[in-house]
Amino acid sequence: MNKLFEQRMQKLLQNDYPAFESALNQKPIKSFYLNPLKHGSIEHLNSAFLTKHPYINDAYFYDYENYQLGKHPYFNCGLYYIQEPSAMAVANCLDFDHDDYVLDMCAAPGGKTCFTASKLSSAGLMIANDINKLRDWYFILKMLNVLVFKIQL
């Protein structure tokens, strides 16, 4: 760990720093959610490496050391989207109606945008600014209610 960062965190967290340091040394938790627009199902995936997310519908944790979901053909077809649990929680907690217009000014890498758009109906619109010209998740996931701009602010 960078010494300057470590010193700053020790000063900021004080007595809570050991818990923070311990958390940094834990194995990361990986997750994904099923794309509702593809009517995906986990039946096609190896359930031995999957655990249902306790709070988010159609979301699962997976053992990334033994099951490489990012290399699976269903990932490239948009059946599911791999996303960190903390990022998934943000979009899941947003209070919006299914026909709202939602603006994401910092849509890189696009996971929260995709998750939010999947919760909107066809009457809703997700407007995203994603500066990566090579990224096409919205197309792969067949999200027709997403309008993407590539504006560097």
Where in the sequence are the language-model features?
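S-adenosylmethionine
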Residues: 1-153
